[in-house]
Regions:
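Domain-terminus/edge residues, biased toward the C-terminal soluble/receptor-binding domains
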Residues: 73-77, 85-187
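Active-site-adjacent loops and short helices of periplasmic peptidoglycan-processing enzymes
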Residues: 1-94, 104
Length: 187
């Protein structure tokens, strides 16, 4: 279990950041934090993971940038753990596809989580009944017009400065297809 220290929330107040309603002081399992990060884009989950893996968010983003360099991501720089807009936080479709391909091929837990249309986080001292979280990738939700039965997930992202972004993959007749789009109109 990881502790949700108050530092994980400091930069997020009044930003409109996506959340999984994790509270300062709450103890949350690593799996639930990964689900909160990957399903509803929980910014506090990203920071909690960062602060429990490294001594600081800056230290964690240094690790992110080292991994990006090792993967050959030449047009990427991370300056925060959650992906909200920052001057020195950027990437390209090609680089995000590289990262997604790496995660899909290497981590079963990643594949298991990104395909979920929803997830029930375990109960905690702050949420005695647990917390239900819902995926922002509507291709995974059979109740929407966007549903695509071959879709296996990955991640949506939406910022005024970046537009609508989507990293997605599908499996069809033994072949995996991966696509990353960025900058789609907001309307």
């Amino acid at each position: 279990y990881y502790s949700a220290g108050s530092e994980a929330f400091d930069e997020l107040y009044d930003t409109g950041a996506s959340t999984a309603d994790i509270q300062p002081g709450e103890e949350v399992s690593c799996y639930d934090l990964l689900a909160a990060l990957l399903i509803p884009s929980s910014c506090e989950a990203a920071n909690i993971i960062a602060l429990n893996v490294s001594d600081s968010i800056t230290g964690f983003t240094d690790l992110m940038n080292e991994k990006a360099e090792k993967l050959g991501m030449e047009n990427t720089h991370f300056s925060n753990a959650h992906g909200l807009w920052a001057q020195q936080n950027y990437s390209s479709c090609k680089d995000m596809a590289t990262l997604c391909e790496y995660a899909i091929s290497k981590y079963q837990v990643f594949r298991d989580i990104v395909c979920l249309p929803s997830y029930h986080m375990a109960s905690t001292s702050y949420h005695s009944d647990g917390t239900d979280i819902y995926n922002t990738n509507l291709m995974l939700d059979s109740m929407t017009d966007y549903y695509y039965s071959y879709a296996k997930g990955i991640k949506t992202g939406t910022l005024d400065s970046a537009g609508r972004c989507l990293a997605s993959y599908a499996e069809y007749e033994g072949t995996t297809y991966l696509i990353v789009t960025m900058g789609a109109p907001m309307d």
